[in-house]
Amino acid sequence: MALYSISKPVGSKINKHSYQDENTLVGKQALSKGTEKTKLSTNFEINLPRRTVLSDVSNVGKNNADEKDTKKAKRSFDESNLSTNEEADKPVESKFVKKLKVYSKNADPSVETLQKDRVSNVDDHLSSNPLMAEEYAPEIFEYIRKLDLKCLPNPKYMDQQKELTWKMREILNEWLVEIHSNFCLMPETLYLAVNIIDRFLSRRSCSLSKFQLTGITALLIASKYEEVMCPSIQNFVYMTDGAFTVEDVCVAERYMLNVLNFDLSYPSPLNFLRKISQAEGYDAQTRTLGKYLTEIYLFDHDLLRYPMSKIAAAAMYLSRRLLRRGPWTPKLVESSGGYEEHELKEIAYIMLHYHNKPLEHKAFFQKYSSKRFLKASIFVHQLVRQRYSVNRTDDDDLQSEPSSSLTNDGH
């Protein structure tokens, strides 16, 4: 059954030269209205992720959603940026030591040492974040941890979807990552959009033909909620490559908000990351890796059953292990909300396993392969495949930790 009953008006095709707002992303001619300062270069449209997603899996049945059925849905990916088998023997640290410093296995870096290794990062000025206010932080984080449990979607909601699969969720979320990056939206906007999709699908069934509409509408809603200057609805519609109209998105927006009872409360995992980062001395390197590892949540449905506070804590725990930043101290346990090391290892293992699978999320990988994110995706893929290979069981290599170190209680 279709999710929305909408009849598209005649002549509703979007004219890419006709619309305007503060975040104009298309058009070769100067617009007659608006200010010049708010317009972006028209060269930007070359990389716009404008397309109809999931159109190549329209015949995939619910019961045939294995790797063979969804082969056409996987977009090509150039793995030239990753090390080859011959390069795997080279120390990963030597390639990215200027960006991400990996301490020796027996090192116990102090907070003062980590402060010297800080790099420029968009989250450096955490003091301006009201959630980090010392006077109110305990009450604030107690509230958002309760909210975190309230906002959990049904981790098995795909069982009630007749036409959708988890693979389709990955494809949709990767497309949203592309749009999110091209629109230069806040990180919180992406997480809220995905949470809206997951919570909505936990309550309602959705047809494959309306799945992209659900995704783009969720991103629009999240943008209105989080952004200071939200892109116009025409911008979002344009990204669907004519698959939907402005009216379609407006109807979907009203319907989705009614299903969610207009409740858009959602604690971003970045709030928990920043809290832990504060406890460890604001090490921007571990925090950057933590952001990358946390975003795996968008593509691995096994993480849906965990609250975002625990996923963020596990991401920081794993990033510290990968960079050998020392043990998970009582101070870090307290700042994470009380999560002990043994409670985080299961999630850390899921994150490790993600990197032992073939790469297929191009937009996600490329996003974190930039200098802005310290080439975190390249670094982690190479390091995990070296140090935590699924086929590795020996502990003889003194330069790495045993493959079981994240699954057993021992160190």
Swiss-Prot record:
Q: Which InterPro entries match?
A: Cyclin, Cyclin-like_dom, Cyclin-like_sf, Cyclin_A/B-like, Cyclin_C-dom, Cyclin_N, Cyclins_cyclin-box
A GO biological process of this protein is: negative regulation of conjugation with cellular fusion
Q: What is the effect of changing T329A?
A: No effect on protein stability
Signal sequence, start to end: none
Tell me the keywords, alphabetical order. Cell cycle, Cell division, Conjugation, Cyclin, Cytoplasm, Cytoskeleton, Mitosis, Nucleus, Phosphoprotein
Q: Which PANTHER family does this chain map to?
A: CYCLINS
Region Disordered: start-end pairs: 57-89
Localized where?
Nucleus; Cytoplasm, Cytoskeleton, Microtubule organizing center, Spindle pole body
Q: What name does UniProt use for this protein? A: G2/mitotic-specific cyclin cig2
Which GO MF term does the entry hold, naming one? cyclin-dependent protein serine/threonine kinase regulator activity
Family, according to the entry, reads as follows:
Belongs to the cyclin family. Cyclin AB subfamily.
Oligomeric form and interacting partners: Associates with cdc2, res2 and rum1. Interacts with pop1 only when phosphorylated.
**Region (Interaction with pop1) location:** 181-273
Cross-referenced Pfam families, in alphabetical order? Cyclin_C, Cyclin_N
Q: Does the keyword Cell cycle apply?
A: yes
Q: Which PROSITE patterns match?
A: CYCLINS
Any single GO CC term annotated in Swiss-Prot or TrEMBL for this entry: mitotic spindle pole body
Q: Where is the Cyclin N-terminal domain?
A: 139-265
Q: What induces it?
A: Highly induced upon nitrogen starvation and during conjugation.
Q: What stretch of residues is annotated with the motif Destruction box?
A: 51-60
Record PTM: Phosphorylated.
Q: What is the lineage of its organism?
A: Eukaryota, Fungi, Dikarya, Ascomycota, Taphrinomycotina
Bias (Basic and acidic residues) occurs at 64-78
| Functional description taken from the UniProt entry | Essential for the control of the cell cycle at the G2/M and G1/S (mitosis) transition. Interacts with the cdc2 protein kinase to form MPF. Interaction with res2 promotes the phosphorylation of res1 and inhibits MBF-dependent gene transcription. Forms an autoregulating feedback-inhibition loop with MBF which is important for normal regulation of the cell cycle. G2/M cyclins accumulate steadily during G2 and are abruptly destroyed at mitosis. Negatively regulates conjugation via interacting with cell cycle 'start' genes. Degraded by skp1, pop1 and pop2 in the G2 and M phases of the cell cycle.
